[in-house]
Amino acid sequence: MKHSHVLLLLFVQVIVLLPLLCLSDDFVNSRATYYGSPDCKANPRGHCGYGEFGRDINNGEVSGVSWRLWNNGTGCGACYQVRCKIPPHCSEEGVYVVATDSGEGDGTDFILSPKAYGRMARPGTENQLYSFGVVNVEYQRIPCRYAGYNLVYKIHEKSYNPHYLAILVLYVGGVNDILAVEVWQEDCKEWRRMRRVFGAVHDLQNPPRGTLTLRFLVYGSAGINWIQSPNAIPADWTAGATYDSNILLT
């Protein structure tokens, strides 16, 4: 219990450093560019650790975000509406993207996939927009909506039962950030905090044996709360397997 109180106080202090736009309805001025890609999709080796998932999520309309928005990985999976500001070429709606990587260029907060960048254009003006390379934009954080999906965790391919467990947190709905993940250690009657390796990947050396119960420290419109997964990871977990937490974040 003491451990949980200390951890909560720690994250209360950290929260003041998070971008205030996370829960704002206002658009923020910035710049955006796009990266080269042979198939118009994202880099599977992005800093969030999503792999192929990061290429296909949201129909490939994804973005690398600035270090400020990436925020040491807590910004992975955040959703944004981004719209460029060149009236003859830019649509009013812009594009809705998921943050799957980090990176920044000349004053940019977004390095969009080519597909996402083109979606900001009015029909028939995509080539003109691509020719600019970098454009002024405005953006806002919006709720992520994954129809039919609860929060999911995938056992990272480098995990090795029973000595090493790493998980990748996927489908974080709403305007929520995962600040920490803990595993219940039954014999010690305490929660063990997993280390954020990078992005959305958390790991633990020598995890407890048997079924594994996880809980997540979630920051969103409801404040900071621990949410425990009703579904445990089975004792015979294997690398590459995916498990439904039965947690629906909205």
Swiss-Prot record:
Gene Ontology CC terms, in alphabetical order:
extracellular region
Q: Where in the cell is it found?
A: Secreted
Q: Which residue positions does the secretion signal occupy?
A: 1-24
Q: Which residues form the Expansin-like CBD domain?
A: 163-245
User: Which keywords label this protein?
Assistant: Glycoprotein, Secreted, Signal
Q: Which residues are glycosylated?
A: 72
List residues of the Expansin-like EG45 domain: 45-149
Instruction: List the PROSITE patterns hit by this protein, alphabetically.
Output: EXPANSIN_CBD (PS50843), EXPANSIN_EG45 (PS50842)
Which domain of life does the protein's organism represent? Answer: Eukaryota
Biological process according to GO: anatomical structure morphogenesis; plant-type cell wall loosening; sexual reproduction
State the similarity comment: Belongs to the expansin family. Expansin-like B subfamily.
| Protein name, per record | Expansin-like B1
Q: Which gene encodes it?
A: EXLB1
